Amino acid sequence: MEIILAEPRGFCAGVKRAVDILAITLEKYKNERQVYVLHEIVHNKYIVEDFKKQGVVFVSSIKEIEDNGGILIFSAHGVSKNIEDEAKRKGIQVIDATCPLVNKVHKEAKRYENSGKELILIGHENHPEVKGIRGRVNNPITLVQTLQDVYDLKVKDPDNLSYVTQTTLSIDDTRDIIAALKLRFPGITGPDLKDICYATQNRQNAVKKLAEIVDMVLVVGSKNSSNSNRLLDLCTARGKRAYLIDNYRCVNKSWFQGVEKIGITAGASAPDILVDELMDYLKVSMNVEVSVMPGGIIENVQFKIPNLV
């Protein structure tokens, strides 16, 4: 049996930055102040549970933190302006681990609003990134999730529209939605696909190629990870069996019956250790040969850690 690894896979620069910020902050203050994270630092069960064991407290609301208490880290997904303001009012020291590419979308949304545009957001309801983007502007943003949403869309002025997008969407689906928006509202302005982050694009392009040359794909990532779910969707859309797994313990050996080539990829919030453990498990469980998919992109993007850390 042959295992082919997607390239690239796993951590993106924004996730690595957020995880590093939390690790450095914890090391610096663990004996002095409680470290909190609003929501999950990234959408990966292993990462969150590991930091919990080290003493990090994950909260769903700033109300759970006492005034002037501890250090609060905003997750990679970003937060609304109201949450920032609430933390200031409570005297909580904040370290912002928002991905710089998400911050870019925040600035775009604000710029469009300041120019008087009615805003449309392409994204997934209730995703923390979407909540953060919506909370960066004063006026309501209309959320579009599907092509049907575009057809049903009602706007104030069809000649005065702009859109932004969540960074972790399906490139193919987003391209179709943008095309539908431009067809229905020819005057609409927006960033094309540029707001879909480089890592999301690279991992989706890689898994498309991977799905063409294997019989089955294992996607390492958590169920609440948007980008991991998109990788799964791309495989199944191409008629390939695919499974989203947190770790090697989720593997069912019956999946491999009749399979000669297994593809493995990992979402942008899945650490290398989970892929390594999966590989070790498969090597012990069955006779496998391992290779890396040819022609993959080697990423070298790095984001700066804030000076406050």
From Swiss-Prot:
Binding locations of isopentenyl diphosphate: H43, H77, H127, S225, S226, N227, S269
Binding of (2E)-4-hydroxy-3-methylbut-2-enyl diphosphate, residues: H43, H77, H127, T167, S225, S226, N227, S269
Biological process annotations from GO: dimethylallyl diphosphate biosynthetic process; isopentenyl diphosphate biosynthetic process, methylerythritol 4-phosphate pathway; terpenoid biosynthetic process
Keyword entries, A-Z: 4Fe-4S, Iron, Iron-sulfur, Isoprene biosynthesis, Metal-binding, Oxidoreductase
Cofactor names: [4Fe-4S] cluster
UniProt GO molecular function: 4 iron, 4 sulfur cluster binding; 4-hydroxy-3-methylbut-2-enyl diphosphate reductase activity; metal ion binding
Binding site for [4Fe-4S] cluster: C12, C99, C197
Enzyme Commission number(s) of this protein: 1.17.7.4
Keyword rRNA processing assigned: no
Disulfide feature: none
Pathway(s) the chain acts in: Isoprenoid biosynthesis; dimethylallyl diphosphate biosynthesis; dimethylallyl diphosphate from (2E)-4-hydroxy-3-methylbutenyl diphosphate: step 1/1; Isoprenoid biosynthesis; isopentenyl diphosphate biosynthesis via DXP pathway; isopentenyl diphosphate from 1-deoxy-D-xylulose 5-phosphate: step 6/6
InterPro entries assigned to the protein according to its UniProt record, in alphabetical order: LytB/IspH
Binding-site list for dimethylallyl diphosphate: H43, H77, H127, S225, S226, N227, S269
Catalyses which reaction(s): isopentenyl diphosphate + 2 oxidized [2Fe-2S]-[ferredoxin] + H2O = (2E)-4-hydroxy-3-methylbut-2-enyl diphosphate + 2 reduced [2Fe-2S]-[ferredoxin] + 2 H(+); dimethylallyl diphosphate + 2 oxidized [2Fe-2S]-[ferredoxin] + H2O = (2E)-4-hydroxy-3-methylbut-2-enyl diphosphate + 2 reduced [2Fe-2S]-[ferredoxin] + 2 H(+)
Active-site residue list: E129
Cofactor binding comment, as recorded: Binds 1 [4Fe-4S] cluster per subunit.
Short name of one Pfam family: LYTB
Family: Belongs to the IspH family.
Function: Catalyzes the conversion of 1-hydroxy-2-methyl-2-(E)-butenyl 4-diphosphate (HMBPP) into a mixture of isopentenyl diphosphate (IPP) and dimethylallyl diphosphate (DMAPP). Acts in the terminal step of the DOXP/MEP pathway for isoprenoid precursor biosynthesis.
Protein's recorded name: 4-hydroxy-3-methylbut-2-enyl diphosphate reductase
Gene: ispH
